[in-house]
Structure formats: C-alpha cells, structure tokens
A protein has these predicted regions:
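Polybasic, low-complexity intrinsically disordered tails and interdomain linkers
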Residues: 24, 36-38, 63
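N-terminal structural module
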Residues: 10-31
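Short amphipathic alpha-helical segments enriched in hydrophobics
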Residues: 26-29, 59, 66
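A compositionally biased, intrinsically disordered/low-complexity signal enriched
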Residues: 19, 46-48, 55, 111, ...
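Short, structured secondary-structure boundary patches
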Residues: 53-59, 146-151
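Hydrophobic, ordered structural segments
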Residues: 48, 52-55, 63-80
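A structural signal for small-residue-enriched, beta-sheet-centric alpha/beta enzyme cores
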Residues: 2, 7-14, 34-43, 71-106, ...
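An amphipathic, aromatic/His-enriched active-site/gating alpha helix that lines ligand/cofactor pockets
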Residues: 58, 62, 156-159
Length: 182
C-alpha cells in the first residue's frame, strides 16, 4: 500500500553541514523530518516526508545549503507505507515463512530499495536500517511467502543496481526463532 507521500533523502559528508541543511529544508517547505542523524564515516543523513512538491522544494534547498558536502540525494514518490513504517525500527510480522535481506554499501539506498521491494510483491517490510551503528552501510529485511520474498529482493536490488549491493539473501522456510533476530 502506498502512502501517497514522497520522501526526500540527502546524505552529506559533513555532520555540521547536514544539520544546517536540515534546518534550511524544514524552513523551505512543509515537510516532516523522518530521520536526521549522524552515521558512521562522519556522514549525516536526512529523510523528510510530505507532498511531492514540498519534498522537491525542500530537497533543492538541502542540496543548495549542503553544497559539495552532498554525497547523494533521491526522491521516492508515493512511498510504500511499509517501508516508511520500518524506517530505522523493527516491525514485527505475524508469521515468518521466508526472510529476505539486502545489504547496501551506503546508507540511503537501503530505503530506496526497500520501497521498490515492497511495491513489487506482497511482503512485510520488517526493518530498514539507514546506517546507524553499522559502518555507514544500510540494509532492509522483508518477510513473507518465499516466492514473494524472492521477487521483492530482486526488485530492491534492481532499483539501486548490483554495484550498490554488498549482499542479498533469501532464506526460505525460516526457523521460527529467526523472528527474534530480525
């Protein structure tokens, strides 16, 4: 299910510049900061949500203020509500049949890939980690029926490209205790 809102994602190589960009982004448009944090490698990530036009204006201001400290920026239109709900927190699934994990080289592509995965197949997004405490990398996990999980993982990888991926795993018939680990 899509949430009919957009997400703006900015990754900066400077924590101070990131905080300045966040302030400018929030002042420039009617957006809600979903994530704003320092991550490993001295980077700062910002994720804002709102109507597409507001997010576009906010992201433009963030890129302007961030200048050469901007490492990456993306917009996700009509973000899937499951990807947004699992952003930097674990969302328990009722039943776990299969588990899919995609680990990304950088933080923000994990969110972009998780959104694509959730839109491609009927899966539950269990978590989207955007770099906090994991060396600046990112990952997402999805659970569901094995075929759906395979489809979701493939769609997530396709959305960001193989070069952005560290690893992708599908565990069919996951053990019941795996639920506590994801």
């Amino acid at each position: 299910m899509q949430a009919n809102i957009a997400l703006g994602l900015v990754e900066l190589s400077s924590i101070a510049r990131g905080i300045e960009a966040l302030d400018a982004m929030c002042k420039a448009a009617g957006v809600k900061p979903e994530v704003h944090q320092a991550i490993s490698k001295g980077k700062y990530i910002i994720v804002v949500s709102g109507p597409l036009g507001e997010v576009e204006s906010s992201l433009a201001k963030g890129r302007e203020i961030g200048g050469n400290a901007v490492v990456a920026s993306h917009i996700i239109r009509n973000v899937h509500s499951g990807a947004l709900a699992a952003l930097n927190k674990k969302v328990k699934a009722d039943k776990i049949e299969a588990v899919g994990i995609v680990e990304t080289k950088e933080a923000l592509p994990a969110l972009f890939a998780a959104d694509a995965a959730a839109k491609a197949a009927f899966v539950h997004v269990a978590e989207v980690n955007t770099g906090k405490g994991i060396g600046g990398k990112g990952y997402f996990t999805v659970v569901g029926e094995p075929g759906a999980v395979r489809t979701a993982v493939s769609a997530g990888v396709k959305a960001i490209g193989e070069d952005a991926v560290v690893s992708r795993i599908v565990i069919p018939n996951a053990h019941e205790h795996l639920g506590a680990a994801i």
